[in-house]
Amino acid sequence: MASRHTRFRFFYRVGFTPWEGHPIGQSLRDLVEGTEGTPALPTGQALDVGCGTGDCAIYLARHGWQVTGVDYVAKPLEKARSKAGNADVSVNFVRADVTQLSQSGIGTDFQLIVDNACIHNMSGSDREAYVREVGAVAAPGARLFIAAFPPGGRFGVPGIDRAEIERRFASGWTLLFTGDEQELDGRKTPAHYYLFQRHA
């Protein structure tokens, strides 16, 4: 089986990117913009892991966050930089692997980390490294937002269920909220979101 690096480089090369171009999910918008009963999360340093062509990173920058977006494929990062320029926002897009964040030079004090459909594509060993590395770059009290398909939710995506999410983040994180997210791929496939807080 091809590695995830090889698969995604191939997908971008041939233009098969069905995960791109969907609206920002309501659960993330509620966190960033606030709701009638809940204020918006205070802005600061944000990290978008597996940022692709940058839609989420640009959205966060438009709402006052200082954003770093990471992806290990060069082609989408080129497009992301162009889109950020057209949107007149500043985002630091970095080519890096989410399983090696602490070696990428991006810093270690992110107050918000966003994963829109990254961890659910990974193997078990990569997920273990992901959890370690996300924890290494998170500030005390940081929020981690994950939107992911469950197993069997989308063809070609391994998926990840709530039990595994909770098990992997049991040390060093507290699960604040979880729920359904219908807009991860334009309401075609059920998905779930998880909001964690890093222990101080």
Report each predicted region and the residues it spans:
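Short catalytic micro-motifs in class I SAM-dependent methyltransferases
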Residues: A117-N121
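A conserved beta-strand element that flanks and buttresses the S-adenosyl-L-methionine
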Residues: V114
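Class I (Rossmann-like) S-adenosyl-L-methionine-dependent methyltransferase catalytic domain
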Residues: M1-V49, T53-T108, M122-A200
